[in-house]
Amino acid sequence: MKKYLLSLLAAVTYTTAQSVSGSAEGFASGVTGGGGATPVYPADTAELESLLSSEGEQVIVLTKTYDFTGTSATGTACYSWGTGEGCQLILQDDCGDTPSTTVTYDAAGKTPIPVASDKTLLGVGSEGVIKGKGLSFTDNVSNIIVQNIKITELNPEYVWGGDALTFDGSSNICIDHVETSLIGRVHYVFGYNPNSGITLSNNFINGETTYSTSCDGYQYWGLELVGKNDSITFKGNYLYKTSGRSPALSGSTKFHACNNVWSDNNGHAIEGNEKGQGLFEGNVFQEVATVVSSTFWEAGDLFLSSADGTGNDACASYIGRNCASSIYMNDGGDYTSYTDVSWLGDWSGLTIAECAEAREIEGTVPTSAGNTL
């Protein structure tokens, strides 16, 4: 009887986790992923890779840790940021005049799992963890949902040791309630091929790390966005202990950042080139040394909503409502002069997510972001 009850309890628990919680907001609205496909539970890492890469609709449920670590490789690593304790090395064959060494690392971290179209990947509670390998969305894949999982331990000591989530020629993808931590290079990287209709929501970008380029436990590599005409909704995310590229609008990206919390950033948050477009509203910047990098921001199109509402009504002509006010707490740099919104005319036809005032979300986002469902 006891065994039967335990089995019944497990079945009930899994049933509640087999369907997506909520729906995608913003640019990925309408995404269905694996739809109503019968949920499958991969037994091991090999089956997980096989299911994610297979054709057709799939709902894949993670109930444990899938550990890809332990596949050793050796290579040359450069001491590009010093030899002190906590300094990252960079994996590359030629270090030039920079001191170098031979290192052993996990080979799996450098090769992410390719995810095929029409997939839903769900975690049960806090149990769904992928350790030592990331996910990639390339070659025109579309209609994918990833929700309530954790991706962690991708060679954190080494730049080029692995990226958590890679997008390069993809569309209609929602990444929701995902925690990324201890990542060798970038948490979210968007390659040069277009990525349209992407929503990153309620995620925890945990930059607290054992190794970093600044040798101080703050990760520099947050979000690198180099795609052509990418459209990304970034809502409800918590970014903790980063020091740069959070995000880097390095391509011609349309980036809507709404109701996010940046906390304890000892470098800079926003950077980008002359083609990037960033609409930032209803956000909280708390203890951010430099909100926008004057060194790395190359006069692209950027709007930062004000704290007191001044100028936020300028958004109404383009998105049908005023932009939500933001909160700036003990922050540095110039974050008051990014007031032009005329470039939002380029966003005609895009689905713009609703956005609350920052004061309404500042206490909830840090505790709800990540694999907390």
Swiss-Prot record:
It comes from the Eukaryota. One of its GO terms (biological process) is cell wall organization. GO terms for molecular function: pectate lyase activity; pectin lyase activity. InterPro entries: Pec_lyase, Pectin_lyas_fold, Pectin_lyase_fold/virulence, PEL. Keywords: Carbohydrate metabolism, Cell wall biogenesis/degradation, Disulfide bond, Glycoprotein, Lyase, Polysaccharide degradation, Secreted, Signal. Its EC number is 4.2.2.10. The active site is at R245. It is found in: Secreted. Residues 1-17 form the signal peptide. Glycans are attached at N140, N229. GO terms for cellular component: extracellular region. Disulfide bonds join C78-C95, C87-C215, C315-C323. It catalyses: Eliminative cleavage of (1->4)-alpha-D-galacturonan methyl ester to give oligosaccharides with 4-deoxy-6-O-methyl-alpha-D-galact-4-enuronosyl groups at their non-reducing ends. Pfam families: Pectate_lyase_4. Belongs to the polysaccharide lyase 1 family. Pectinolytic enzymes consist of four classes of enzymes: pectin lyase, polygalacturonase, pectin methylesterase and rhamnogalacturonase. Among pectinolytic enzymes, pectin lyase is the most important in depolymerization of pectin, since it cleaves internal glycosidic bonds of highly methylated pectins. PANTHER family: PECTATE LYASE 18-RELATED, PECTIN LYASE A-RELATED. This is Probable pectin lyase C. It comes from Emericella nidulans (strain FGSC A4 / ATCC 38163 / CBS 112.46 / NRRL 194 / M139) (Aspergillus nidulans).
